[in-house]
Amino acid sequence: MTLDYTEIGKRIARRRKELGLKQSEVEEKADLGYKYLSNIERSISIPSVEVIMRLAVALDTTPDEFLIGTLSHDNQEWKNISEM
């Protein structure tokens, strides 16, 4: 399976906009550097697995939504893991 980083960036941007958040707000919540989220959303930067996980927590979803475009069936289990 090949990851499409353009689609990942679009999914992250879509989720952020659904929640009505600015890029700077998400960067702060996910402890990302200035403009890094912008670069991810525009496919300039490729996020690590750790960054995708932090973005999922910041955007109240699972990494699955960004990586494959669907929510995990057990969102509560992911929330428990992410709080560890």
PLM features per residue range, with description:
Residues 3, 10, 20-21, 47-50:
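Residue-level signal for the short linker/turn that defines the boundary of a DNA-recognition helix
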Residues 31, 50-65:
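DNA major-groove recognition helix of helix-turn-helix/homeodomain DNA-binding modules
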Residues 31-46, 68:
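Recognition helix of helix-turn-helix/homeodomain-like DNA-binding domains
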